[in-house]
Amino acid sequence: MSTAPTTDERVKKASFLTKALRRTEVGALLGAIAIFVLFTSTDTTGNFAKLPGIAGWTDIAAPIGIVAIAVALLMIAGEFDLSSGVMVGTTGLLVGMLVSKLGMNIWLAIVIGLVFAAFIGFVNGYMVLNTKLPSFIITLGTFFILKGANFALTMILTGSVRVTGVEKAAGYDSAKAIFASTFKIGEQNFQISLAWWLLLTVAATFLLTRTKFGNWIFALGGDIISARAAGVPVEKTKIVL
């Protein structure tokens, strides 16, 4: 009796290129390459693709990219946070106020700022879960509250919309070395924020593809009812995100 496997001629074997193009990350990579080629070809200075030019635009892109990592995780889970951008400014403003007005060590101020940001995120998640309103609406309200508070508090406490004197705070030099220093590639200086961006991208990729929590994130974005039926802690995952 033959044990040779049977084949179904109706099933067409997909090529490597077809399989690759079906992956969403490949589409994103091709889009990034296309944009890079477009800007390089239209750059009249000729510096865009050279080290000085790359250092310039990655200095701008890195902080945005770091925020985008967190936003991307939330979007994969089927939610959206409109307040993430202003939350960055609010946290930085809070840290600046603590060190300039209260003379606090900058590391303690950073910890307080992160705890404050986590609390706002918790409130957003709690409101979304309990009001059943779209996260877009909840975080839009948070956006306006934080933006108004930023202007009001800085004007009341400093008389302007800027906070100065942070460089005099205790712990400033060590914090600057970790978060605001530079490193060299060839003869060109790059901001350390670029290294943080790459590191956090790798960490987020590992989280999504190699951990149970990453599976929960994908499950929420796919079908929340099926995810709940499969045992995914929906409320817990949304609050954490």
Q: Where are the predicted features?
A:
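Transmembrane alpha-helical segments of polytopic membrane transport and secretion proteins
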Residues: 1-30
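Interfacial loop-to-helix junctions that mark the boundaries of transmembrane helices
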Residues: 17-25, 49-59, 103-108, 180-195
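Hydrophobic alpha-helical transmembrane segments
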Residues: 25-30, 57, 65, 86-90, ...
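Generic alpha-helical transmembrane segments of integral inner-membrane proteins
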Residues: 30-41, 69-70, 90, 94, ...
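Single transmembrane alpha-helix segments in multi-pass membrane proteins
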Residues: 33-43, 50-102, 106, 126-133
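Small-residue-rich segments of transmembrane alpha-helices in multi-pass membrane proteins
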Residues: 63, 92-93, 141-150, 229
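Helix-loop-helix "hairpin" substructures at the membrane interface of multi-pass membrane proteins
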Residues: 105, 109-113, 119-124, 128, ...
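Transmembrane helix-bundle core of multi-pass membrane transporters
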Residues: 136-211, 239-240
